[in-house]
């Protein structure tokens, strides 16, 4: 038997690719809308929930810092750090945490040494940082789902080259780019892309988030319910053992 756990995101990149997945006996997916997508193509999909919900639980937040997440790719980091620096310079009364993925990324942060309202962190786990924060600004990626599951209101940002943006806009067939918004099919986190991704606009959305926290936190909770399962990783493993005999 052929089991395909977490298949390619054909619902993003084009439905033609779905034909190759018919070779599998079981398609095991981790997002609720994928079940309906495959059903439309007469393919049965197995869904027990998203495995991230086993590991990311809502964190009690007592701090007042703003978490900045520039991404992991060099291009993302170099695009976002100047924007983050402008925000740090504008909001001198706020305290910031700049979370990097690697010590190799420190070479891009020389300009940040002159600011006393920002702390650069590399090794600390995200869930241990979130408790110290009131919101985050995060480069689009799976980290946006982690932030939502941890309960931290966020702004999703992304900058790329104009050509890559045009190609992505042409290929992508979905309305949102961040996973929390896709799950709920609603805007939980504002998405500021390309020309919208500039400091003053981000600052405006920060203010708006803090003024509407109860509504945003309710949406975050509704999103969690959509992807939550009971012992998700164990459920997929049990299914593999049972059906793989």
Q: Where do the PLM segments sit?
A:
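Conserved donor-nucleotide binding/catalytic region of nucleotide-linked donor-dependent transferases
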Residues: 195-223
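Charged active-site motifs of nucleotide-sugar-dependent glycosyltransferases
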Residues: 61-67, 95
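Generic beta-sheet signal
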Residues: 5, 30, 48, 99, ...
């Amino acid at each position: 038997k052929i089991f395909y756990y977490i298949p390619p995101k054909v619902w993003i990149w084009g439905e033609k690719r779905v034909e190759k997945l018919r070779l599998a006996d079981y398609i095991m997916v981790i997002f609720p809308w994928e079940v309906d997508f495959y059903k439309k193509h007469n393919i049965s999909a197995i869904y027990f929930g998203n495995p991230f919900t086993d590991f990311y639980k809502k964190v009690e937040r007592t701090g007042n810092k703003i978490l900045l997440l520039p991404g992991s790719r060099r291009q993302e980091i170099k695009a976002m750090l100047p924007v983050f620096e402008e925000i740090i310079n504008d909001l001198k009364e706020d305290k910031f945490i700049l979370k990097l993925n690697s010590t190799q990324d420190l070479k891009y942060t020389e300009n940040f040494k002159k600011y006393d309202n920002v702390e650069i962190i590399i090794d600390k786990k995200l869930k241990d940082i979130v408790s110290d924060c009131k919101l985050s600004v995060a480069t689009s990626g799976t980290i946006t789902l982690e932030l939502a599951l941890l309960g931290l209101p966020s702004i999703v940002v992304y900058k790329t080259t104009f050509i890559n943006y045009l190609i992505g806009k042409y290929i992508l067939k979905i309305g949102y780019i961040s996973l929390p918004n896709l799950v709920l099919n609603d805007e939980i986190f504002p998405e500021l892309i390309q020309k919208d991704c500039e400091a003053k606009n981000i600052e405006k959305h920060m203010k708006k988030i803090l003024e509407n926290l109860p509504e945003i936190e309710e949406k975050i909770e509704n999103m969690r319910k959509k992807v939550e399962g009971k012992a998700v990783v164990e459920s997929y493993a049990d299914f593999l053992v049972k059906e793989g005999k």
